[in-house]
From Swiss-Prot:
Family: Belongs to the SHMT family.
Subunit and interaction comment: Homodimer.
UniProt binding sites for (6S)-5,6,7,8-tetrahydrofolate: L130, G134, H135, L136, T363, P364, F365
Keyword Protein transport: no
Function per UniProt: Catalyzes the reversible interconversion of serine and glycine with tetrahydrofolate (THF) serving as the one-carbon carrier. This reaction serves as the major source of one-carbon groups required for the biosynthesis of purines, thymidylate, methionine, and other important biomolecules. Also exhibits THF-independent aldolase activity toward beta-hydroxyamino acids, producing glycine and aldehydes, via a retro-aldol mechanism.
EC number: 2.1.2.1
HAMAP family tied to this protein: SHMT
Protein name as it appears in the record: Serine hydroxymethyltransferase
PROSITE patterns in alphabetical order: SHMT
Subcellular location as annotated: Cytoplasm
Amino acid sequence: MTKQGNDTQKRFFNDNLQTVDVAIFDAIRGEFERQQHEIELIASENIVSRAVLEAQGSVLTNKYAEGYPGKRYYGGCQFVDVIENLAIERAKKLFGADFANVQANSGSQMNQAVFLALLKPGDTFMGLDLNSGGHLTHGSSVNMSGKWFKSISYGVRKEDQLLDMEAVERLAKEHKPKLIIAGGSAYSRLWDWKKFREIADEIGAYLLVDMSHIAGLVAGGVHPSPVPHAHIVTTTTHKSLRGPRGGLILTNDEILAKKINSAIFPGLQGGPLMHVIAAKAVAFEEALQPVFKDYSANVVANAKTLAKTLQSNGFDIVSGGTDNHLLLVDLRSKKVTGKCAELALGRAHITCNKNSIPFDLETPFITSGIRLGSPAATTRGFAENEFIEIAHMISEILDNLGMAKSDEDNSAVEMVVRKKVEDMTNKFPLYSYLHTC
């Protein structure tokens, strides 16, 4: 090899990102600064540990490993087998399940795998309506689940925004679905897993629980577990579980476990993302520690505090409060749309998302509400006092926005709140080792 070729190879293995691609480096640096200086209230987001970051950014990204531990289609898998087996065993221990598949690349793909394993195109299934707090993959007409299968939606009661279990039972008996999905992305109350299973058993249907939003709370013991009741449980590994982005499928049924494994590979995916599976394993181990129970309890306490303080400030909370990590704020009485609220709060460095509320008359691009969540800020160390202050900051901005004639009329309030946000976030630094990079 020539000296020039040798130098090129050395640079390939040793030059850092800032040297190789300054545009991407700057964008990542900008995102780090955004996360450091903004209050993250998006309920589906969290902040992972340095250990999770290191596992995901490791040399495992180089390795192809089609198949499952001990049954790979490639050589050189002795170490990735160790990693995947650790992830499987930790997931089983964490949730008390007999079988676990850790290969799903995303929440959508894990749910698609269940559909592939249990249903045929055109089969009927039931899921929570999107406006009632459901998820796209639970039967939305714009999603594969609603395009390839006959989707029957159930919802919440108009008078209290709680799940209408009588309607669930009535619809199940009327339509005889092969699958019933429980779980959602914007429902703030406890789920009656036992009742869902009774309804499923009565009509001979499978029960799938998608606990993506509450998995960390289940792991921490502050939310009832669906694992003893559901035929299959799916969850993303980020959100309240505080791991990398990805999916996890659990079951206590060996026959269903085999169907799920075949649906993931070779049904939907090829080689698994071993660097992500390693990060999942790390996150599962973190969630098995006693301190995670404290974290989960704090997540719920902080969400309750946020909801109660906003209520005291005159805001309407869907269903009257929360039992988990999230809350939906109905903004109609404030004469503000979800879209305008999201933008105004964003300008003050409080990040949330516009969200439809039950029986919403606005489009999903406008909405009548916002969704707020406590996991990420709780990870930073925010406690109930901080969440009380956050509620007051939100109130300042949105109360004034409702009276303002334009965004410019709200700018002075947003500037004052942005300074308060800066003072608060500076007290809770992220990844201090990165500040010197």
